[in-house]
Amino acid sequence: MSAAPGRSQASSHRSPQGEGTPVNAHAVSRLRTARLAVSSKPYVARGSGLGRCPSCRLVASHCICALRPQVPTRAGVCLIMGDIEALKPSNTGWLIADVVADTWAFGWARTAVDPALLTLLADPQWQPYVVFPGDYVEPGRVLTALPPAEDQEAGQGGKRPLFILLDGTWSEARKMFRKSPYLDRLPVLSLHPEQVSNYRLRRSTHEHHFCTSEVAALCFELAGEQRAADTLAAWLDVFTDHYLSIRQQLPLDWQSDAHQRLQALTGPAP
């Protein structure tokens, strides 16, 4: 399954079942729709009976579609996602596709690969990097930094960075890395951030494990695209505030630090 890059909008229409469907949905949204179409039973997430906005996955009172930022970027993102990852309301690959127009999303399978993914990896405009810890690969493939943006444009035929993110649990990501031979020829970008993860929607026993959106922000920072990195971080924080407000049944602070950081990056809300 795959979804090509695209920008989703805040508007939606209602399906015959009464569930909203995003208009001009982005890559992860389209992958979710494709995955649901082949599912033998409905995917029931926590709070699924609340009636979620199809474009931001939050209940109407907490909808953030009007706040959604979009930042022009030179780099792109290719998400290779575990089987049900796109179905999870807390998935943060979705947030990357919100912000970065050049985002692709593909479902992973051990025995098959989407031809569209192979076409993307072979596209001469892109220089793909598999983002994964360098401890799991031979040193000759590992990079810990990227050339400055101006050097990237001058070298490698002006190729644009394409960050390949393996989106799933840590065990799923390791399996995807080991059992995807089409990734074996690609350089591996190994991140070594000084900070620890601030992700609050799922638990991890390792503070150095970052959620997918945090990893993307680190990649854009390495690529010299600081505004994209900061916007991804702020958008994750706003989404997290709204998501936890619903889960914990707490009042929502529309003037929180996260909202103010996002507004400073994107301008006044409409």
Task: State each model region's role.
Residues 66-93:
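Short microdomains enriched in Cys/His and/or Lys/Arg
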Residues 53-56:
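Short cysteine-rich clusters marking metal-coordination/redox-active sites
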